[in-house]
């Protein structure tokens, strides 16, 4: 079975398909199929484990990985680093504003402490990603997911990062099988 899959993968490579068909059609189909597979696998992992393997910022991350995989924002270093910064900044903001034991903002509403935590988390995430040279826009959503209390337990943040890592592995494998020179870690020089 593996030989069949790899044989098909060699024959149906995205760059060669783009040469024969509309690039918008091929890339749209590639993004569609891989978005379904990536988020479907994460959602299945969430159902099986009862852990939050699926969260809103995985959606834009998957889109970057499968539509613009060669942009710096989609490389593994920026994806993992950006989400780690976002999760850490969100949690630090919860701690500083005394909100670690509060219900999520969607349940208890938004009070001034939550305003401060959300604003601080996004500011910290934005600045730290620039300073660390790991820009990944979906991490802005990750930090708000945490600072708004949707995921607020340290173990949930660990699961969040495992989910991001699994998505990066999927992105690497799927893009490479499709013939796309997706980077192993850092962005390619001169790309983006």
For the regions a protein language model found, what residue spans apply to each?
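Alpha-helical transmembrane segments and their membrane-interface boundaries
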Residues: 1-101, 105, 112, 119, ...
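Generic structural marker for isolated residues within well-ordered, non-membrane alpha-helices
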Residues: 42, 125, 143
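Transmembrane helix boundary and interhelical junction motifs in multipass membrane proteins
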Residues: 54-59, 136-142
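Hydrophobic transmembrane alpha-helices of multi-pass, membrane-embedded glycosylation machinery
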Residues: 61-63, 142-146, 165
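Membrane-helix interface "capping/anchor" motifs
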Residues: 70-79, 128-139
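Generic transmembrane alpha-helix signature in multi-pass membrane proteins
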Residues: 94, 128-132, 141-148
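Internal alpha-helical transmembrane segments of multi-pass membrane proteins
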Residues: 101-136
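Juxtamembrane/interfacial segments flanking transmembrane helices
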Residues: 134-141, 178-183
């Amino acid at each position: 079975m593996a030989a069949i899959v790899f044989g098909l993968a060699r024959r149906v490579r995205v760059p060669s398909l783009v040469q024969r068909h509309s690039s918008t059609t091929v890339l749209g189909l590639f993004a569609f199929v891989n978005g379904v597979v990536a988020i479907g696998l994460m959602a299945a992992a969430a159902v099986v484990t009862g852990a939050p393997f699926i969260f809103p910022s995985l959606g834009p991350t998957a889109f970057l990985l499968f539509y613009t995989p060669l942009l710096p924002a989609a490389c593994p270093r920026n994806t993992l680093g950006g989400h780690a910064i976002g999760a850490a900044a969100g949690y630090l903001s919860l701690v500083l504003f005394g909100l670690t034991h509060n219900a999520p903002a969607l349940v208890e509403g938004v009070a001034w402490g939550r305003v401060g935590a959300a604003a601080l988390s996004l500011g910290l995430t934005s600045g730290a990603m620039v300073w660390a040279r790991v820009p990944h826009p979906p991490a802005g959503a990750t930090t708000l997911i945490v600072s708004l209390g949707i995921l607020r337990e340290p173990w949930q943040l660990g699961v969040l990062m495992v989910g991001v890592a699994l998505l990066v592995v999927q992105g690497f494998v799927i893009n490479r099988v499709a013939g796309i020179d997706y980077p192993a870690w850092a962005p390619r020089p001169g790309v983006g």
